[in-house]
Amino acid sequence: MGSNKRAPLPYRTDRTKNFEKAWKRYNKSGRYDMQAAAVAMNLVTNRNPVPAEYRDHELTGEWAGFRELHIGGDFLLVYRVDEKSEIIYFVDLGTHAELFE
């Protein structure tokens, strides 16, 4: 007894066109585990702690204000959290080479 039944309201979400194109491309190719990508998205959307294996971190330089987490290996999810508006923007998916070079 006594378990807490309260939870914060999940963030609202939005997706960029780049994110949607990447999702469709990777989902069609079968190259990466898109179920794992959906799990990672749910973790951040529902304000759950992101496990250390995702290596979630802030980006710097021209990507300052964005975050990145590792879905598996070098497969990355780039997103941005707008705390004031309580929205998570899913920005892109891909490898380091595809996203940052």
Model-derived features: positions:
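Basic, Lys/Arg-enriched alpha-helical interface segments
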Residues: 1-73, 82-88, 97-101
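Acidic, metal-associated active-site segment
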Residues: 79
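Active-site flanking residues adjacent to catalytic metal/cofactor-binding acidic residues
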Residues: 91
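Residues forming the ATP-binding cleft of Hanks-type serine/threonine protein kinase domains
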Residues: 94
